[in-house]
Amino acid sequence: MLRLPLNIPLFSKGTLHVVGPKNIDIHRLVLHTVNYRSPATAGRLMIRKLVAEKLNIPWNNIRLQRTAKGKPVLAKDSLNPYPNFNFNISHQGDYAVLAAEPELQVGIDIMKTSFPGRGSIPEFFHIMKRKFTNKEWETIRSFKDEWTQLDMFYRNWALKESFIKAIGVGLGFELQRLEFDISPLNLDIGQVYKETRLFLDGEEEKEWAFEESKIDEHHFVAVAVRKPSGSRHQDVTSQDDSKPTQRQFTILTFNDLISSAVPMTPEDPSFWDCFCFTEEIPIRNGTKS
């Protein structure tokens, strides 16, 4: 398995033609700010780096597609030795993250704890009331100070998003169908925890495992993993989940990210000019990939 976070820098002119025009939504680039587009571009570069270096597919032969619900996948005609190879990306706050599995179904989400853009934390919780079950709200509100409550809110949110992204159903999934029994309540930076359990429609989902991490003081990462039917991989529930592990994310620099990159198209100065010309638009905290 592979877990890769990337601290997001500003992109240079040469980056854009490395990604390739078919993998960049030009309309999206125009609509949003550079700070939002940069992690989205980073996510695409992370996928290409992963596929090129782990599956030995030449960078310029990599063909990516999206499912009907928008999840990025390798094209079926790719020279892929792992037919169940699965990956997922997320970006929010200061990081873009990627999780990949050779056989297991996987989803990843990252959330940064920050104050709501408008109103108080209790007002924000009231607006989001229907996103969590009563038991989840009890856990969130069990802490005395509001900042720690907000921490737990975003940790719960990352868990739900990781599951939804793993199954690839998009925005139509009713979040209250999911209930997480979170354990432990406090996470140490750099540790990986696998004790949290998922209940779907009141029934425990034992085929699913959740890896929780804190990259730093403000960023939670949740990885959802499920064994597909017919897989020879060991059962995910057979692992010892009683203790945190030291398996940390591999931190990439920008130079790491593009170390194996090759240009996909001739450099187009007008494309870069268009990229830089876009007016910056304030982005709400919940913007995701």
What are these regions (language model features)?
Residues 1-289:
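Core catalytic alpha/beta fold that binds nucleotide/phospho-ligands
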